[in-house]
Amino acid sequence: MSVIKMTDLDLAGKRILIRADLNVPVKDGKVTSDARIRASLPTIEAALKQGAKVMITSHLGRPTEGEYSEEFSLKPVVDYLEEKLSSPVRLEKEYLEGVDVAEGELVVLENVRFNKGEKKDDETLAKKYASLCDIYVMDAFGTAHRAQASTHGVAKFAPVACAGPLLSAELEALGKALDNPARPMVAIVGGSKVSTKLTVLDTLSKIADQLIVGGGIANTFVAAEGHNVGRSLYEDDLLPEAKKLLISCDIPVPTDVRVATEFSETAEAILKSTHDIKDDEQILDLGDESAQRLADILKNAKTILWNGPVGVFEFPNFRQGTEIVARAIADSDAFSIAGGGDTLAAIDLFGIADKISYISTGGGAFLEFVEGKKLPAVVMLEERAKQ
């Protein structure tokens, strides 16, 4: 993947526009989870250190496009950055006609979704973004799968368009896991529905030595083996697809599970064989035997790609399967890459972030990359690198 990298450029005295992913949860004007901003700090600091005139922007939430709304302002992000960088950070609301920035100064440009035409990748808007800078830095992997004015169009018209350190690291880590992985390569795909992850499962079945399925997805495979799954979440219409995958790939289907008669945090967890599930029961987690079998597989892996929990880990009684799998990944010597919102929540819950080789900041972009789809923002950077 040939793109210009920010780290290869001389930024001194240049106007730099960084498109970051600062779409963080905010409550009462305060940032409640700072993971995405923390991930962007090294990029900001590197540009400031070189004496660049630094502008950074992002979307936040889903405001009505073209209208300012205090609820979706980047002001809480500015407050956070001021505290972390121990220096003043300016928030610019009106910036499309130009912004004055001093060398070594950081200015945050207000939520891009307040600008009409952002989501449609409007050319006039993209040109206005491009005219603000000498160098455009795309560093938001989480939005690289969307062709929008601040992620795609601007890169077409900016004097120079490059990949920031975070985006470069994401692409390298995913490339390492997918293009020529150290083997055995094990992929874990959890989540509620096969339908939303069918392309991912299909792609990974051709790359992985073993494909682990969890959550509602695993229930469809349990049903495909002819077992009663009771009131479990599963997709009857996708049983033929599941059967095909069972033939083409090594998928360790659960042999024991934790079930309940209701979907609730206080429901009693009943451990049983997949042969014995009753009509009024639903599978909410893996059983001990199945979880341990997965842990043994992960112990011998050399590459692990993890997307999605293997049970309803939000309920303490049905957390064990995901915890056993998560700790096995943490203890493994494999190169491990994890992505997706629920996966990151599980990593936080079990406190294993420092034991995962690479944690991806992208949800949809992570899945689309794994599916083998081209990410529009990355394609544009590749095109600009050829010019």
UniProtKB/Swiss-Prot annotation:
Keywords: ATP-binding, Cytoplasm, Glycolysis, Kinase, Nucleotide-binding, Transferase. Its EC number is 2.7.2.3. GO terms for cellular component: cytosol. The keyword Secreted does not apply. InterPro entries: Phosphoglycerate_kinase (IPR001576), Phosphoglycerate_kinase_N (IPR015824), Phosphoglycerate_kinase_sf (IPR036043). It is found in: Cytoplasm. Pathway: Carbohydrate degradation; glycolysis; pyruvate from D-glyceraldehyde 3-phosphate: step 2/5. It is an enzyme of class 2 (transferase). Transmembrane segments: none annotated. GO terms for biological process: gluconeogenesis; glycolytic process. SUPFAM superfamilies: Phosphoglycerate kinase (SSF53748). Substrate binds at residues 21-23, 36, 59-62, 113, 146. The keyword Kinase applies. It catalyses: (2R)-3-phosphoglycerate + ATP = (2R)-3-phospho-glyceroyl phosphate + ADP. It comes from the Bacteria. ATP binds at residues 197, 314, 340-343. It holds the Pfam family PGK. Belongs to the phosphoglycerate kinase family. Monomer. PANTHER family: PHOSPHOGLYCERATE KINASE, PHOSPHOGLYCERATE KINASE 1, CHLOROPLASTIC-RELATED. This is Phosphoglycerate kinase. The lineage of its organism: Bacteria, Pseudomonadati, Pseudomonadota, Gammaproteobacteria, Enterobacterales.
